[in-house]
Regions:
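C-terminal "post-core" interaction segments
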Residues: 1-189
Length: 189
């Protein structure tokens, strides 16, 4: 964080992972608010919230695309709906199911859906995805010619949009820091 004015979190092509891991990561960026709730078929609801343990309150932008799914959607939805980050990119995949592996007597396993998750505002994103605040798609040619070493550089068009969005947020914050006629002297100095 030393010297950073803001952050770009890249969740593009992140297929997800563990529910608990996404909650832990969200708690590093959120001081308050709901992160996610899960609802079982029986209607049992479990709400998970931030714990006041955010590592920073500096502005952030999150990059998402159609490859962002499951746990990465939990994280991006929590940051967006708690007004902690702007989402840039393309609509996410839309996997809003909580699954568990059940062991079978022959030693094999079976994946079973045990619940669905909802964003902080109660939105079921399964098969719908999460829409970005700022749409930014790669062209067919750019996707075909893209090299991994260009990720997060000026050759990455979605990253350039994320940087521009972050700069706009930082500029707006600086313009709000000093308001003539206000008692906001500390911010003005």
């Amino acid at each position: 964080e030393q010297g950073a004015q803001g952050y770009v979190l890249d969740l593009r092509s992140n297929p997800g992972g563990l529910l608990e891991a996404s909650i832990d990561i969200a708690r590093q960026w959120l001081n308050e608010g709901t992160i996610v709730s899960t609802r079982t078929r029986e209607g049992i609801r479990d709400v998970r919230r931030a714990t006041g343990s955010a590592i920073t309150d500096k502005p952030m932008v999150v990059l998402i695309d159609q490859g962002s799914a499951s746990a990465s959607e939990i994280l991006s939805g929590a940051l967006q709906e708690n007004k902690r980050a702007q989402l840039v990119g393309q609509k996410t995949f839309g996997k809003g199911l909580v699954q568990a592996v059940r062991g079978l007597s022959d030693g094999s396993g079976m994946t079973v859906t045990i619940a669905k998750y909802l964003t902080p505002n109660g939105t079921d994103i399964h098969k719908n995805g999460i829409k970005p605040d700022v749409e930014a798609a790669m062209s067919e040619k750019e996707m075909r010619d893209f090299k991994i070493e260009n990720l997060g550089t000026s050759k990455d068009s979605q990253y350039r949009v994320a940087e521009t969005t972050l700069i706009k947020v930082l500029t707006m914050q600086k313009n709000e820091a000093y308001r003539p006629g206000s008692a906001n002297l500390e911010a003005a100095l």
